[in-house]
Curated annotation (Swiss-Prot):
<protein>
    <recommendedName>
        <fullName>Energy-coupling factor transporter ATP-binding protein EcfA2</fullName>
        <ecNumber>7.-.-.-</ecNumber>
    </recommendedName>
</protein>
<dbReference type="InterPro" id="IPR050095">
    <property type="entry name" value="ECF_ABC_transporter_ATP-bd"/>
</dbReference>
<keyword id="KW-0067">ATP-binding</keyword>
<dbReference type="InterPro" id="IPR015856">
    <property type="entry name" value="ABC_transpr_CbiO/EcfA_su"/>
</dbReference>
<keyword id="KW-0472">Membrane</keyword>
<comment type="similarity">
    <text>Belongs to the ABC transporter superfamily. Energy-coupling factor EcfA family.</text>
</comment>
<feature type="domain" description="ABC transporter">
    <location>
        <begin position="3"/>
        <end position="246"/>
    </location>
</feature>
<dbReference type="InterPro" id="IPR030946">
    <property type="entry name" value="EcfA2"/>
</dbReference>
<feature type="binding site">
    <location>
        <begin position="40"/>
        <end position="47"/>
    </location>
    <ligand>
        <name>ATP</name>
    </ligand>
</feature>
<dbReference type="GO" id="GO:0042626">
    <property type="term" value="F:ATPase-coupled transmembrane transporter activity"/>
</dbReference>
<comment type="function">
    <text>ATP-binding (A) component of a common energy-coupling factor (ECF) ABC-transporter complex. Unlike classic ABC transporters this ECF transporter provides the energy necessary to transport a number of different substrates.</text>
</comment>
<dbReference type="GO" id="GO:0016887">
    <property type="term" value="F:ATP hydrolysis activity"/>
</dbReference>
<dbReference type="Pfam" id="PF00005">
    <property type="entry name" value="ABC_tran"/>
</dbReference>
<dbReference type="GO" id="GO:0005524">
    <property type="term" value="F:ATP binding"/>
</dbReference>
<dbReference type="InterPro" id="IPR003439">
    <property type="entry name" value="ABC_transporter-like_ATP-bd"/>
</dbReference>
<keyword id="KW-1278">Translocase</keyword>
<dbReference type="InterPro" id="IPR027417">
    <property type="entry name" value="P-loop_NTPase"/>
</dbReference>
Length: 288
């Protein structure tokens, strides 16, 4: 499912003394089946933008098109349930939203709220619990008896049970250790490939943006500053640092190597294998 934002703008508490501009003239598209990342410093508008993708927020200017559904600023919208079934959002610390007596009931809540029968919802719960790396026996347990990592997977299963076509991830690994973060990100990537999802990742992790995204949207102060492939975005690391962002370790090490040997490698490397191959000729002859 394709998503397109055209001249999108948003103000909190518009036409009040407390009006605050959050988004201005945002133009970006996410192709069907693509994996994109949105990066930017805190307050750049990333989370506000993502809440427009399933109409949790409505634009105050411009429009957004999700599949065949068009949402135009100032036009009253009907039947947003259909849109919200198609666009699933995993927020930061999604486990905080768990509330039911059992894992099964928690996973079934979303689908049943959108009209799925209890029987079908339970079948979905059995399916998605395996997709998030857990087993069926956990369905009868209280979510509050689980570990933090298991609770997060259960919360994610609740989103997947809606059978979305678009998956929006808002810092989905916040608070996890490096191993847990890698496991969750690999799980999302596998789901993206297996289900043909359109995936949009909001992240502060430049490593994740470089590793998984086909396209990166760089935001600053509510506007889109730059759109490009990971190689294009990280080709000028100093610009990102000036914005208060980090760069992937491989990119940082490449910069150190280029300065030390006064050389310019032929491309911006995103993996250790790429960087090793690029450095090899210089190391073989002891420097440039």
């Amino acid at each position: 499912m394709e998503i397109k934002l055209e001249q999108l703008g948003y103000c909190y508490q518009k036409n009040s003394p407390f009006e605050k501009r959050a988004l201005l003239d945002v133009n970006v598209s996410f192709d069907s089946g693509s994996y994109s990342a949105i990066i930017g410093h805190t307050g750049s508008g990333k989370s506000t933008l993502l809440q427009h993708l399933n109409a949790l927020l409505m634009p105050t200017e411009g429009k957004i098109t999700v599949g065949d559904r068009e949402i135009v600023a100032g036009v009253k919208q009907k039947k947003l349930r259909d849109l919200r079934k198609k666009v699933g959002i995993v927020f930061q610390f999604p486990e905080a939203q768990l509330f039911e007596e059992t894992v099964e009931k928690d996973i079934c809540f979303g689908p049943m709220n959108f009209g799925v029968s209890e029987e079908d919802a339970k079948l979905r719960a059995k399916k998605v619990i395996y997709e998030v790396g857990l087993t069926e026996e956990i369905l009868s347990r209280s979510p509050f008896e689980l570990s933090g990592g298991q609770m997060r997977r259960v919360a994610i299963a609740g989103v997947l049970a809606m059978d979305p076509e678009v998956l929006v991830l808002d810092e989905p690994t916040a608070g996890l250790d490096p191993h847990g973060r890698e496991e969750i990100m690999e799980m999302f990537y596998n789901l993206h490939k297996e289900k043909g999802l359109t995936t949009v990742l909001v992240t502060h992790s430049m490593e994740d943006a470089a590793r998984y995204a086909e396209k990166i949207v760089l935001m600053k102060a509510g506007t889109v500053l730059k759109i490009g492939s990971p190689r294009e975005i990280f080709a000028k690391p100093d610009e990102l640092v000036d914005l208060g962002l980090s760069v992937p370790d491989v990119v940082r090490f490449q910069g150190l190597f280029e300065r030390k040997f006064n050389v310019k490698l032929t491309k911006t490397c995103l993996t250790i294998a790429e960087l090793t191959a690029e450095m090899a000729p210089y190391l073989a002859k002891g420097g440039a």
